[in-house]
């Protein structure tokens, strides 16, 4: 009586990036019988963890062969998927890269691809007897796009940092009655990846005090001190 030989088949799942075998599925049956196996569920499992299918050697309708000395082997090859994060693809650092994977790596901190910077002009009154104008603050932003490995979460590459503008505007110094500023304006500055700051100081204007040619001249009229007026066109004068 002819008896069908017991056969074994192995389906290997291989990480193309590392060359490592992710796992081996082993099935067994009789020679000539259909192999009751599908790679679909396992491929979906790895796709949920950031992999992309490269090739699947396991054929539809596969049967066990008649050679018991050699195991039938098929390879399913997968590679690491990639995904961007940046101004056009923003994500929170707590967001999973692979939402269907409970152990998914998360996106990197936002400051890895976005930096907000400022240029601030501070106004100070040297004698503290007047209220200085409010600080002038201008904003700029640097961004870049990172490409991430979906399996590991590591950064694979990045575009150069780019600012949303090249320069901060020049800032005319506001006038302050009774005071002159040490700068008539603050010049335009190039946007850098650091915060910039400059201070404008207001000092009190001098007083005009009339004096008689002869001390204690009783005929010299009593005149109070006269403040020098501000230059209406230049707060530094």
Regions found by a protein language model. Give the residues of each.
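Conserved "repeat-terminator" motif of extracellular CCP/Sushi domains
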Residues: 1-14, 64-118, 122-124, 187-213
């Amino acid at each position: 009586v002819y008896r069908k030989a017991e056969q074994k088949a192995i389906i290997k799942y291989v990480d193309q990036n590392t060359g490592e075998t992710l796992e081996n599925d082993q099935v067994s049956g009789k020679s000539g019988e259909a192999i009751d196996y599908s790679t679909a569920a396992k491929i979906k499992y790895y796709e949920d963890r950031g992999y992309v299918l490269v090739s699947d050697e396991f054929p539809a309708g596969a049967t066990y062969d008649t050679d018991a000395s050699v195991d039938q082997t098929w390879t399913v090859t997968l590679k690491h998927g990639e995904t961007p994060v940046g101004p056009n693809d923003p994500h929170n650092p707590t967001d999973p890269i692979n939402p269907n994977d409970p152990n998914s790596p998360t996106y990197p901190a936002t400051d890895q691809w976005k930096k907000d910077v400022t240029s601030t002009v501070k106004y100070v009154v040297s004698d503290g007897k007047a209220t200085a104008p409010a600080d002038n603050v201008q904003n700029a932003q640097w961004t870049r796009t990172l490409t991430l490995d979906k399996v590991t979460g590591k950064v694979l590459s990045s575009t150069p940092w780019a600012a949303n503008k090249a320069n901060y505007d020049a800032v005319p110094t506001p006038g302050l009655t009774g005071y002159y500023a040490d700068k008539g304006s603050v010049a335009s500055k190039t946007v850098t990846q650091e915060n910039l700051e400059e201070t404008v100081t207001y000092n009190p204007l001098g007083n005009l005090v009339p004096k008689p040619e002869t001390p204690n001249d009783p005929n010299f009229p009593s005149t109070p001190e006269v403040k020098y007026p501000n230059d209406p066109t230049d707060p530094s004068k």
